[in-house]
Amino acid sequence: MKSTLRISLKSGEKIFINGAVLRVDRKVALEFLNDVTFLLENHVLQPDQATTPLRQLYFIAQMILINPEGREQSTNMFRKSVSMLLNCFQHDEILAELKRIDGLVASGKAFEALKAIRGLYTIEEKILSNQEMTPATIEQIRKEIAPWR
């Protein structure tokens, strides 16, 4: 880490740091002085919110950060899911970004991958509302990822 990172949390807010879940009892500022893997509570997707292919991919990617003990299993599932999505999506921007996201996770940058996946949600909504991806394909993706929910 080239510089310190400062994060402000509100009373009752949670943060996931290196696999541990912390809840603060009052407004607090945290300053990270070295490299740390963290995820803010408002960026954590709950299983019942993983309702689209990209949200399911996000859920798996967040498990890489939240559950260090299961990192290898989560990473393997992530790679399998990306491969499946590359075969299902036909939108050039999503395909290019999925390849970049895969590279981010492979290089240990899962946090950056989460931000990139969130950036694709709007495009995915348009694709799904225009039925550019068949319901059968969406259902196939859901079945593949179901064990994670």
Swiss-Prot record:
Signal peptide: none annotated. The keyword Repressor applies. Pfam families: FlbT. Keywords: Bacterial flagellum biogenesis, Repressor, RNA-binding. GO terms for molecular function: mRNA 5'-UTR binding. Belongs to the FlbT family. Has a post-transcriptional repressor function in flagellum biogenesis. Associates with the 5'-UTR of fljK mRNA and promotes its degradation. This is Probable flagellum biosynthesis repressor protein FlbT. It comes from Agrobacterium fabrum (strain C58 / ATCC 33970) (Agrobacterium tumefaciens (strain C58)).
